[in-house]
Amino acid sequence: MSISINPFVTTNAYGTFSTQSDGYVQGEFLDDPAIRFQLAGGPLATAETLPMWGGVAISETTDNSGTIGLGGAIARASAEANLTGFSVFSQAYAWVQTPQSPVPLAANGQTIPFFRLGSNARIPVACDATLAASLASGLINQQVAWDFTNQVLIAYTTGTALPVKVVDVQIGNSKIVAYDPVTGFATWTNTGSVAVIQI
């Protein structure tokens, strides 16, 4: 006797299954019951020319809009001097996603969830691959810097170091954001390097 088998051909969405599933998603706050109440929010500033996503260095201003409770305006930080925290995807409701731009993006006026410096939140951020390799197995208090143009953690050279601890590094197996300024689309790079920073 024989049993005929005709299994269905199955496919998986790209990046959903792999032999190595140890990785992070840029800008997705690592759950911590003591820190989650530090999550804050504010509208994306009207002067911002780029959409916002998680894992971006931000600058927060005081609320002078007359709308009590919305929080201060959030913009991209341009230097250490105006860096106040990092944006996250956690509780980023109603951010825009399309098939061409699968990364959730926020436009002007939409609420940006973020953690302030000093909150002790652990946030995976995009990291230069060479830096990630040098940080692996190192002390958590190594000095690092931030590339405010490309929104990526880079090696410290001179000036003020980023006031963070690097508590983990994942090389080549994490999802990081790739933004195309020409099309305005943001896609996931599934082979990115990430550093988990405690801010």
Predicted features by range, described:
Residues 1-199:
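Surface-exposed, low-hydrophobicity beta-strand/loop segments enriched in small/polar/acidic residues
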